[in-house]
Amino acid sequence: MTGNFKGVIFDIDGILEFQGKVYPGAIELIDRLRAKGLVIRILSNSTLKSREYCAEKLVKMGFSIFKEEVITASYATARYLKRLNPKSCWVMLKGKGFTEFQDFIHDDENPAYIVVGDYREEFNFQNLNKALKLLLAGSKLVVMIPEK
């Protein structure tokens, strides 16, 4: 069954679960693949959710998943930003995904980078205008696609 594969990547929503319900056989499949020695990675394109939140949710549903196996859009973006080593950033993001950026110096007045995620109701003219002025003054932009 494993062939030349070293690992398997699963999306959370619509693959492992949908609207809070586990797809039949999904838990057993992951357990079986793990028992065969395959590396498991779980992906979510959500900017609102942290790795920890996703792992905890899946564990409550019966999956044997570890936080380190989960990659969310906010986590991947925070890792990318860390490689850039900015002096500061303004993270326009709400929800648990914001916790992935806790190690950065946050500055919404003179950030080196502006990170845009799902900012919900605070994604308004005032903040967009502020971001545009900061970009024109030299801040750089990193964008995540908001959740639908």
Regions found by a protein language model. Name each.
Residues 2-148:
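HAD-like aspartate-dependent phosphatase fold
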